[in-house]
Amino acid sequence: MELILKNNVKEARTEMGLSQSQLAEMVGVSRNTISSIETGQFSPTAKLALVICIALDKKFEELFYFD
């Protein structure tokens, strides 16, 4: 059974009133990368996932989970 990393990044981002571009700038990636993470097309590295958690003021387990 393959585990797939899912996330709540979009929900947390919109809850904070941030656009994809704003979050991307905060974490040092492109807007396209944020979009790809939100849609599940790209799984972030552990480092990038942690930076996103810090930017969105969330714990890792609040944003990322395996399905």
Regions found by a protein language model. Give the residues of each.
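N-terminal flexible/basic segments that precede or flank functional cores
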Residues: 1-3, 21, 59
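Short amphipathic helical patch at the helix-1/turn junction of helix-turn-helix
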Residues: 3, 14-15, 43
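Short, charged recognition helix plus adjacent turn
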Residues: 3, 65-67
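Short basic helix-loop element that most often maps to the first helix and adjoining turn
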Residues: 7-26, 51
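Conserved hydrophobic/aromatic packing and binding residues within compact polymer-binding modules
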Residues: 9, 23-24, 34-37, 63
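Recognition helix of helix-turn-helix/homeodomain-like DNA-binding domains
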Residues: 29-42
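DNA major-groove recognition helix of helix-turn-helix/homeodomain DNA-binding modules
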Residues: 47-62
